[in-house]
């Protein structure tokens, strides 16, 4: 399930590549 095209859902920073996981979203 994708909540937004900009903020991907995540469980950890590693799910976001060079971004960080914050409150379930990559920022």
From Swiss-Prot:
GO CC entries: extracellular region
Lineage: Eukaryota, Metazoa, Ecdysozoa, Arthropoda, Chelicerata
Protein name: U18-ctenitoxin-Co1a
Main localisation: secreted
Location in the cell: Secreted
Keyword Kinase (UniProt): no
Described purpose of this protein according to its UniProt entry: Not toxic to mice by intracerebroventricular injection.
Gene source species: Ctenus ornatus
Tissues with expression: Expressed by the venom gland.
Keywords assigned: Secreted
Domain of life: Eukaryota
Family membership noted in the UniProt record: Belongs to the u18-CNTX family.
Keyword Secreted: yes
